[in-house]
Amino acid sequence: MALSSQDKPKQSLNSRIAYALTDRKILHFRYDAHLRQQVMKQLSKTQRELLNRLAAAGVDALPKKQLDTLLKELKQEVAKVYQEMTAYTQDELSGFFTAETQHLHQLYNDEVGFDFFNQVPEYKQKANKTATIIAGSPLEDWWAKQGNDFAFKFEGIIRQGLLDGQQTSQMITDVKHLMNTSRRHAETLVITAVAKVADKAHQALRDENLDILAGEKHLSTLDTRTSTVCQLRDGLMWDLDKKPIDHDVPYQRPPLHPRCRSILQLVTKSWKELGIDAEEMPSSTRASQDSPVSEQINYENWLKSKSPEQQDQVLGKGKADLWRRG
């Protein structure tokens, strides 16, 4: 964390963990940006090839049999690239899950100050490397759906364009609009998949440390892009039986919606609840664990805890200067 040592005693342990997790989320954003860049390279390359094939063939003058053959070949190319993106993202996210599980274990223990949280055993990490499930469906199915939707609409543009007497150039323009939409959908899927795998790692750490936890707390990234549902849930807690604590909002694991940036923080019990003699512990650790949370953890407070250089890195220098000037 980037908080100074003199700031730490003012915060509870759970508050410090929240700040550290917010730091961690920035790394998630960078990772999903890397994944999106790689996916866009694959997708854009294939889409350029489709446009070149359409232009070279002059589809507005093709006999029906040749048109059917061309469309079949192009749809096969679309299916192939989406299968490749599925394999690539699944492999990447499998490695990300392992790394995230290990980093979260280290993060929580670093903030506690000693080896407090149990690590997720390697055999459980391997068992958890199953298909990423988003809104009830495997990532593979989401990619297949996007590929099928694109192929269906692509063929529809060509066939309807011919019925309407359009020139090849007009149909290519419509296909380009479809491609822009498909790229946005692919980006959204990558962002959401990274968030889901990160949550899965958090859940694995939780299940390994139920005896020291009081529950889970929803942490939203609070800025102008925060959804209403995430604003509502920010700061709310649930016990380990998923029952709301002092509210009536039902328990739900993130991502709550496409591009969701929320997380569920693990909230530790107090030393007293754990049956630990706090007098035998370092005073800084003892005080931070049992003190109340000093402030609401949100994006604004988190940014204020960063150095100007770190603020520039997160926001970009221009936006950071504007933010610092209010």
Kindly give the residue locations of the regions a language model identified.
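N-terminal leader/targeting and assembly helices and adjacent pre-domain segments
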Residues: 1-172, 271-326
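Short coil/turn segments at secondary-structure boundaries
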Residues: 87-91, 169-174, 188-189, 203-209
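Acidic, metal/cofactor-coordinating or nucleic-acid-engaging core segments within structured domains
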Residues: 177
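Acidic, glycine-rich two-metal-ion catalytic cores of nucleic acid-processing enzymes
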Residues: 180-282
